[in-house]
């Protein structure tokens, strides 16, 4: 069929043609944001899930929903090696400049901009990557102590007061939160807690890998009372089929029931994989309908594409020792696995592998669902490791 009209869109953070199976969570967040705008008690929302489940796409769609409702937003991705103050400062400046155009909020927004100037100047020594334009001179004593926890609290209070005056809210949409240092997470939690205590319309909607829940708890013990942690998992069977059927139908293409069943089985409902199989099934089929035979042929191309992009980009970041650790996990199956079993597969002591395991957790490759357990953060990564490192040389 015509590849130009292929509706499927595999890619990191690429919006799918049909965002199936996520309506309930979108509605939950919509209600939360409307409540915070009205000054009602509301928990921030932190979505947790494996790679490839569509967290980034969902976060962006929720942001679109919020902005369509007249709510002010920040959109931040927290990459490794960047500080939270450096990520927040320029985005917050843009939001405050927008708020300053509201006549009711102008004075308070400008005060918050003075606070931002003091915040950036005071923290520049500790966080050298802070870069933000100054629109006003700092106000002495406002968010300028040089202590991130107290200064971020003061800054978000000032910003929340401006948003409240404008009858709106400020929502921080932050992706990859698991990469934020725990000290910086603690400061963010404290600031959000204070805003909630004062009924100021400032809230966080974030996303991260499953270890985020534990990191938030370690940063501040009361974090679990401030946040909801919905788990974003694979799509249901029905949602997976809708994610394929509806985009195809919009292009006047049918998909047989057997083809849909095979896609469900091959992808296990992971949205990234659903898009990959949809794309290759479309490109393989000569005409409508897409059949089971088309999907069977497409599976080889889909796996090869995943190996070269989705999986390989993560594999190439690993050291040889880390690759062997993950290959040992893969030998044991999808997981989770006990640390002792992984060590036994490598003929090593558990304690000697501790640094390797910690490095893999920091890189976002594995996580610990329970004490002593280890699991992949990337779906189907065990099968990839067996393909990329066949045989048993890894165990030597």
Would you name each region that the model predicts?
Residues 1-45, 92, 105-108, 394-396:
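A short, basic N-terminal segment
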Residues 5, 43, 258, 297, ...:
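C-terminal leucine-rich, beta-strand-based interaction scaffolds used for sensing/assembly
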Residues 107-152, 158-165:
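Conserved P-loop NTPase mechanochemical-coupling segment
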Residues 211-227:
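Short regulatory helix/loop adjacent to the ATP-binding pocket of P-loop NTPases
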Residues 240-309:
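Amphipathic alpha-helical "lid/sensor" segments that cap RecA-like P-loop NTPase cores
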């Amino acid at each position: 069929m015509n590849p130009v009209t292929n509706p499927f869109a595999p890619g990191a953070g690429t919006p799918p043609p049909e965002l199936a199976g996520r309506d309930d969570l979108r509605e939950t967040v919509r209600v939360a944001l409307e409540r915070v705008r009205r000054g009602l008690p509301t928990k921030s929302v932190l979505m947790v899930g494996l790679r490839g489940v569509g967290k980034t796409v969902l976060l962006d769609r929720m942001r679109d929903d919020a902005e369509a409702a007249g709510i002010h937003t920040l959109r931040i991705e927290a990459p490794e090696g960047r500080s939270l103050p450096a990520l927040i400062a320029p985005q917050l400046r843009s939001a405050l400049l927008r708020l300053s155009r509201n006549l009711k909020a102008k004075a308070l927004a400008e005060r918050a901009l003075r606070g931002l100037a003091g915040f950036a100047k005071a923290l520049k020594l500790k966080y050298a990557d802070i870069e933000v334009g100054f629109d006003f001179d700092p106000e002495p004593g406002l968010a300028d102590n040089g202590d991130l926890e107290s200064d971020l609290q003061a800054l978000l209070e000032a910003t929340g007061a401006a948003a409240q005056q404008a009858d709106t809210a400020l929502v921080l949409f932050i992706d990859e939160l698991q990469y934020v240092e725990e000290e910086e997470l603690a400061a963010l939690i404290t600031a959000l807690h204070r805003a909630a205590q004062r009924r100021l319309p400032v809230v966080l909607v974030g996303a991260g890998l499953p270890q985020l829940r534990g990191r938030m708890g370690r940063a501040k013990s009361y974090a679990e009372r401030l946040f909801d942690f919905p788990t974003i998992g694979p799509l249901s069977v029905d949602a997976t089929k809708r994610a394929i059927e509806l985009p195809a139908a919009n292009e006047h293409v049918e998909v047989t029931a057997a083809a849909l069943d095979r896609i469900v089985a091959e992808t296990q409902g992971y949205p990234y994989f659903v898009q990959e199989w949809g794309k290759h099934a479309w490109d393989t089929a000569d005409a409508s309908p897409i059949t089971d035979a088309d999907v069977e042929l497409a599976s080889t191309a889909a796996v090869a594409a995943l190996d070269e992009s989705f999986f390989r980009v993560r594999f190439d970041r690993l050291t040889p020792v880390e690759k062997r650790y993950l290959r040992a996990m893969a030998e044991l199956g999808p997981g989770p696995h006990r640390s002792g079993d992984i060590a036994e597969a490598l003929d090593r002591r558990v304690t000697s592998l501790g640094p390797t395991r910690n490095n893999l957790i920091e890189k976002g490759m594995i996580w610990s669902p329970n004490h002593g357990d280890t699991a992949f953060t990337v779906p189907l990564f065990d099968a990839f490791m067996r393909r990329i490192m066949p045989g048993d040389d890894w165990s030597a």
